[in-house]
């Protein structure tokens, strides 16, 4: 092959052998694939020519896979251009892709051939895939959902694209020190990404600031300000065992050479010479920059508008390219569906109006008809702080033309209410888009989405019911058919087939087919074998292997030895008070205290447990960071306690991301989804755990409700208040009627005793005290749910001691997870919201 590889830090020298200057993108035989890898190592060089170590091998391997993807990608693009189907464009501020190599060769069904090819270099596929860094383009469930959706769109052969931003440093890389969480820049692009292709011919101008000029004919034009260029980077998204390969187009911000002032530079005014270049770099530097200052708010708003404007200019350009003029704009909604993933891309609405009116010459009514038939909105939260509201003065400063359009949409909506719904006059102030509060006038982005979109959907049945009965109830009375539910889903390719191959092989063996990978409903066939001893033995063996793999990972990243014979109990998600990691760790603290009080003989009768918690706390979210610190401090004490550490260990898993999840989820046995009822829109990690035969302890919140229905109530450890009880319980708390459980008080007192160190946890614990007030009054009902949570944990211990019962419950969990495929979700979006159809590449 021309290469000799050493993986133990040796020279890894290149040996002399001629490599033909020709690649075969469609190679499937190991010898041909190995030749392709050699070709890229020599003719697509990124490193010194006389070394071929693991990183070089990874990049050469990835580029050989990319060749094949580009071939399919081009065929897909040309086929879509020829057929000209209606196409969906999915706009999201986040795409949490994870590693691409395993996913690509898995979807292309060439993983075995690649494994054999790499062995010819003395390499294992797994050690090559470990070289890839996760693309830092997202943070949590919002971005991961978007990525699952892209996988399903491609697999279902749907004409669709994703649009996002190419963040240089992501959200942040999380480091855990004695001081708690520290944030450093994520360096995923330190070298480069072999999966993206820069499109130097796809460049759009994006204007900020400036003023609006009224032309003699009454038309309006946005002029002046500063103009940044949006440059496209394309990432191929292959479908599973299909030629269809769609695009995730990411935008990078850049300034032109003309914006560099050579005179100032040569005059020594170095920073002033490149002001616009610096501002352009800031736009895509990090995901969700801090917005405590006006500068931070402007930057976040710039990011959102940059995504919307670049994407819509690109969409319009493609519409024109396929229609080849003259263009009938009334046909635009029959060819284009724009889906807003939460409120971040809301500016797509006024931007599409602006482009149609100011650039294409449409009148208001025609532009509004096109826009309102094109755009649909997915709501992901009922949390007040997550329903975006932008300062009107900031909006006027940055986007003056858009504020004019938003004002007009608001004016017309208020007029509609006044004319047709006098019964809603008392509600108008809350329903309208503009909140003109003199102290703090804002634009309500969710309201703008609801008024302007043809469809609004929630992401779990409970969440959608809350949207219709509470958050958007007044709108429902005007547009009852506008609101839908689309329960979220996950891609079974990444989340079981690739991340847990042992389990996948067992499922295929017992179902006698592998078609479940694209038809997850077939998993119900496992139910008849739930009591089968042979299946249970195989099930247990595969779980054991995954637990050992997880234990090795934890040792590698934390230095902590954990026992694979203990119950692996995991909660991994963004750190937030409503997700109640605090409830989890308080339960752990109470368990630790009780273990300390037991005799050695009594401890032997308990269920040994390893509790793992992971997730990032936003840098400015103080209480969330205190929770991270508390978990780590508890772990330091518990894990070094020789009396207890054989029965309980606590680990904070740092820098949680997709690749970490692919190790944690298959190795888990119990998963905690314990948010305050009514506050989690859906959640998708619960689906990933349930699919991977992990039992759930949780509240009746989000998708937990539907998971429990599907897998069977007896296979779900339920606790806590229900969503309809929460308002009453908060009111009772305000009125001083809450009486805390003694166990809850005991756990808090134990923290305050200083046993976990000298850090001041009083501000965190104070949030659980009192009856009302900012940062007090236990808004998330940790104290109320604590006793039922502890009771449910006792039931977990009891069930785990009965191995046959636990295995049966585990099998039934996987068997009941068929509903939660993103293929099902996307098929429903395609039929019921987007009105698009399959467009398979022949």
From Swiss-Prot:
GO terms for cellular component: cytoplasm. It is found in: Cytoplasm. InterPro entries: Glycg_phsphrylas, Glyco_trans_35, Pyridoxal_P_attach_site. The modification N6-(pyridoxal phosphate)lysine is found at residue 688. Its EC number is 2.4.1.1. Its main location: cytoplasm. It is an enzyme of class 2 (transferase). Signal peptide: none annotated. Keywords: Allosteric enzyme, Carbohydrate metabolism, Cytoplasm, Glycosyltransferase, Pyridoxal phosphate, Transferase. Its cofactor is pyridoxal 5'-phosphate. CDD domains: GT35_Glycogen_Phosphorylase. It catalyses: [(1->4)-alpha-D-glucosyl](n) + phosphate = [(1->4)-alpha-D-glucosyl](n-1) + alpha-D-glucose 1-phosphate. It comes from the Eukaryota. One of its GO terms (molecular function) is glycogen phosphorylase activity. SUPFAM superfamilies: UDP-Glycosyltransferase/glycogen phosphorylase (SSF53756). GO terms for biological process: glycogen catabolic process. Pfam families: Phosphorylase (PF00343). Phosphorylase is an important allosteric enzyme in carbohydrate metabolism. Enzymes from different sources differ in their regulatory mechanisms and in their natural substrates. However, all known phosphorylases share catalytic and structural properties. The H isoform exhibits higher affinity for branched polyglucans such as soluble starch or glycogen. Belongs to the glycogen phosphorylase family. This is Alpha-glucan phosphorylase, H isozyme.
